[in-house]
A protein has these predicted regions:
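Catalytic domains of carbohydrate-active enzymes that cleave complex glycans
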Residues: 2-256
Length: 256
């Protein structure tokens, strides 16, 4: 069943139902720190009332009430918002990588966390999750590894259990894949990993250009605030890309 059918009560025939979530609001003047961060708070409330809404519909509503009702602004800003999640995935954890952030504060890259004996319990470290070595990268959760894949029902279990059919975005979560494995794109795994990290950085730069074009529809203070935050994001996207690729290159021994 869809989670939505649990929330609306239709799965078990409940007349009264609800949902709970962790808020991202705080003491900042704009509540969420980032002007666009409030969109997540708004989306939670809207989905609690109507889970059938699409991301595009929610973004359209929020943008019109927050920045401008001009269609020329809303159309491009909506596209920017919809693309933003995959941009972050690309420059932080592409192809199903996971939990490779720095220790304790979780801010910034840390694929090397686990090399030191002071890095805490093994299954909380980056090394435990990415398992990069000279042969490849990724966590084998199939029958030849942890067999975590057995917890899923078919047909999803069968889909992800095979390297050949597993979606790219889940590949390294379920499989330890050789560096020279040929991906669906025709690139090797290593080249695809490099491509995804670079694509993430370029996506942020595209958002910067889009926001520069859209700033005329927004008051100067908020326009500059978002512009400044995008500069930080672009810098941090490069930080993630460079740190992760240079670390993984120690094992792949292939050119970036």
């Amino acid at each position: 069943s869809l989670v939505a059918h649990v929330v609306d009560g239709s799965l078990d025939g409940h007349a009264i139902s609800g949902m709970a979530g962790v808020s991202n609001i705080g003491t900042e003047r704009n509540w969420c720190g980032h002007p666009f961060g409030a969109a997540n708070w708004y989306a939670f409330g809207r989905l609690a009332w109507d889970h059938r809404l699409s991301s595009e519909q929610i973004a359209d509503e929020w943008l019109r009430m927050t920045f401008s009702n001009d269609d020329r602004f809303v159309e491009r800003a909506t596209s920017m918002m919809i693309a933003s999640r995959e941009a972050v995935v690309d420059y932080m954890t592409p192809l199903g990588l996971h939990h490779i952030m720095a220790r304790s504060h979780h801010y910034g890259p840390g694929p090397w966390v686990g090399l030191s004996q002071t890095d805490g319990r093994a299954d909380w470290t980056s090394l435990y999750y990415h398992r990069a070595d000279e042969r490849g990268i990724g966590f084998d959760r199939t029958a030849t590894g942890s067999n975590a894949v057995s917890q899923y029902c078919p047909p999803f279990r069968d889909l992800v259990a095979s390297v050949e059919t597993c979606p790219d975005e889940l590949l390294l979560w379920f499989h330890h894949v050789p560096w020279q494995h040929v991906m669906k794109s025709g690139r090797t795994l290593w080249d695809e990993l490099c491509s995804r990290y670079n694509r993430g950085v370029e996506s942020v730069r595209a958002m910067q250009r889009t926001w520069d074009d859209l700033s005329e529809y927004v008051d100067p203070a908020r326009a500059e605030h978002v512009r400044a935050l995008l500069r930080i994001q672009e810098k941090e996207a490069r930080w993630w890309r460079d740190a992760c690729l240079l670390y993984f290159q120690r094992f792949s021994r292939l050119p970036i």
